[in-house]
Regions:
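Conserved metal-binding segment of the jelly-roll/cupin
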Residues: 10-24
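A hydrophobic/aromatic-rich effector-binding and dimerization subdomain
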Residues: 23-92
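Hydrophobic alpha-helical core bundles mediating ligand binding, dimerization, or RNAP-core interactions
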Residues: 40, 87-91, 105, 109-117, ...
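N-terminal positioning helix adjacent to the helix-turn-helix/winged-helix DNA-binding module
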Residues: 79-82, 131-139, 175
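Basic/polar phosphate-binding segments, predominantly the helix-turn-helix DNA-binding elements
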Residues: 114-122, 138-179
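A short beta-strand-loop-beta hairpin characteristic of the jelly-roll/cupin
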Residues: 1-11, 27
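All-alpha amphipathic helical-bundle segments outside canonical DNA-binding/catalytic cores
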Residues: 77-81, 94-111, 129-130
Length: 179
């Protein structure tokens, strides 16, 4: 699995945290098969309607990318059991739907982010990686906006203010395939 241009080899029990705005993809390794579960929710559901300390100190920095969390958790890592416990508890509540289950889910998400922010913050990505990531986001946005038309290499290079050869080299080096 690749998140923000960094590859993470996964194994049974792996947990990957992908925040809003992070570019991510899944690629099969050789002929191995993998089963996975996505748990998707809007981080905004945890935001208070009015500005509070949780919004300003934790959630806003997560949303704008200035606070980065560990992406990949595997069994045996510090805090893996706590992270997995929150996810499993929320999953079990979704499965059984007891009265007021929404409150339990929200509580588990707050607990999860408390564990992550207290123990699993990372330093920012390198400047070079950040620039490549921003270029990739521009490419993806351009493709999303113009997906109904045929997009040429020349058009894509112009959109990024790059020469065609530089665009092709960048895309191949970053994505591992031609445009």
């Amino acid at each position: 699995i690749t998140v923000d241009l960094e590859e993470y080899p996964v194994q049974e029990g792996s947990i990957l945290l992908i925040l809003p705005g992070q570019v991510h993809s899944i690629e099969q390794y050789l002929d191995y098969k993998m089963e996975y579960i996505n748990i998707i929710f809007k981080l905004e559901m945890l935001l208070a309607k009015q500005t509070d300390i949780c919004n300003s100190r934790y959630f806003t920095p997560l949303l704008d990318g200035t606070l980065r969390l560990t992406t990949h958790f595997t069994p045996g890592m510090p805090f893996y059991n706590e992270v997995a416990g929150c996810i499993n508890a929320a999953d079990e509540v979704c499965r059984t739907n007891p009265p007021a289950f929404q409150l339990v889910i929200k509580g588990q998400l707050f607990l999860l982010f408390s564990i992550l922010i207290s123990n699993c913050c990372e330093t920012s990505a390198s400047r070079k990686n950040q620039k490549s990531l921003e270029k990739m986001k521009r490419i993806i946005k351009y493709i999303e906006t113009n997906y109904a038309s045929k997009i040429s290499i020349e058009e894509m290079a112009d959109a990024l203010d790059l020469s065609q050869s530089h665009f092709m080299k960048f895309f191949k080096n970053t994505m591992g395939t031609t445009f």
